[in-house]
């Protein structure tokens, strides 16, 4: 199974930045979701961030909330998500991170969840509603299962907490470019470069930037700031929503957009 370290090291040698799209598993249905993720990989995605739909996604804006609703209505479950990930890994071996909420982990059984998903091909699990203060609750079982740890840093994170987060992260640091929930934005925050620079001074762990990246130019700005990866969620999930009646158009638009971002970084 390909690791974050392998992918980020190889891209660094090539002077490239990782393209990391985010999708909700099962949006709008299992088969279409599978085709979408495969199209993203074919367009140049280096790493995947995938969400398991949840009823109360507090960190997400309306675009991803609606994706959660569509996926839930299509019958997506934790068990089906395992099958989905196995199929993706059979298609292409890239690192996969889950971005999700603790209740889903807890209901399934924390140790069993991490073990089963690592065996299916997941490299890390980022629990959006657990802070670094609660990290010990998941770090032990996650590391025991063979998973890397991923934590979030925001523009408001204090330097001492950045150091703590950096020390506990083994996969990559998910750097939130703007305050608030996920969603496409017209302009990227001018604090990104400073935030990436601070983190780079604290850790050798890869630093990836997400939230609000909606254009190839945004991705270029993030890459030039020194980030190791660019995470794009709402923009590509929005292309699913706007093409629900046209699967071929959906796949074509997602492929074109991600290929443009790949070329920009």
Describe these PLM feature segments.
Residues 19-23, 48-50, 96-100, 125-127, ...:
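Hydrophobic faces of well-ordered beta-strands that scaffold small-molecule active sites
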Residues 30-40, 157-167, 209, 213-230:
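Catalytic cores of alpha/beta
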Residues 47, 52, 65-128:
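Active-site beta->alpha loop and helix N-cap motifs at the rims of alpha/beta catalytic domains
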Residues 73-75, 121-134, 148-157, 182-185:
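Catalytic beta/alpha-barrel core
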Residues 152, 162-201, 239-241:
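Glycine/Thr-rich beta-alpha phosphate-binding loop at enzyme active sites
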